[in-house]
Every structure is written in C-alpha cells, then in structure tokens.
Design a protein with these regions (language model features):
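N-terminal loops that bind phosphate or other acidic moieties
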Residues: 1-113
Length: 113
C-alpha cells in the first residue's frame, strides 16, 4: 500500500486529512498531513517531512502539495532522496479522496488516476 502525505500551508493539510478520514476511517495509517506554518523555516519543514517518510512504513509515497513554487511544494521536491515518491501539486478534496480510494494500486497507476 502507498503512503500518502499532504503537505500544505497550515491548516489545509490537516483539514483535508480529517475530511478524508470521515469518509475512509480505515485510511488513517497510510494518510499523513504536514501543515507548514508561515513562520517555520523550510529546513525545519524538510526535516519533519523526512521524518514522516521514514516512519510511514510504506515503500512508495504520493506527496500532494497545494501550490507549485510555494514552500510546501519546494520542501516536498527536496525530500525524495532515496525514497520512491511521486509529487503532485494542486491538492483538493476530490483529488485526495480519489487517491485514498486507489491507494492499493501501483504508485504510477495511482498518479494516473
């Protein structure tokens, strides 16, 4: 099963995760959220994300961010050293619900859906 991590400006990532868990409560182990507060340094955010990737237990990860070029997306693009990931920007609730419903598919197939 793929790990899915939402990385977004606070509090969007946590809010999206909570909405999805309302529909898919069994997805909690594979769905993580990383809220990036305005005052947090990119280095601190990167370390938090790397910790989530290490601790997730999944071999593949789908990283979903809010805005291309913003800190969450930049942090996500730097976190992939040695980890099999795919990064998609523009996360929204329908996208995340779809990703969670197909979380058992191969990572490349999941990204195409």
């Amino acid at each position: 099963m793929n790990g899915i991590i939402v990385i977004a400006h606070a509090p969007l990532a946590s809010a999206l995760r909570e909405c999805v868990l309302h529909v898919f409560p069994d997805a909690a182990p594979c769905l993580q959220a990383l809220d990036i507060p305005a005052q947090q340094t990119p280095e601190a955010s990167l370390e938090q994300l790397r910790a989530l990737l290490r601790e997730s237990g999944a071999s593949d990860h789908l990283l979903l961010t809010d805005l291309v070029g913003a800190t969450p997306c930049n942090v996500a693009s730097q976190s992939t050293d040695g980890v099999h990931t795919r990064l998609l920007a523009g996360v929204n609730l329908p996208m995340l619900l779809r990703a969670v419903s197909y979380r058992h598919e191969a990572l490349d197939t999941l990204c195409e859906r």
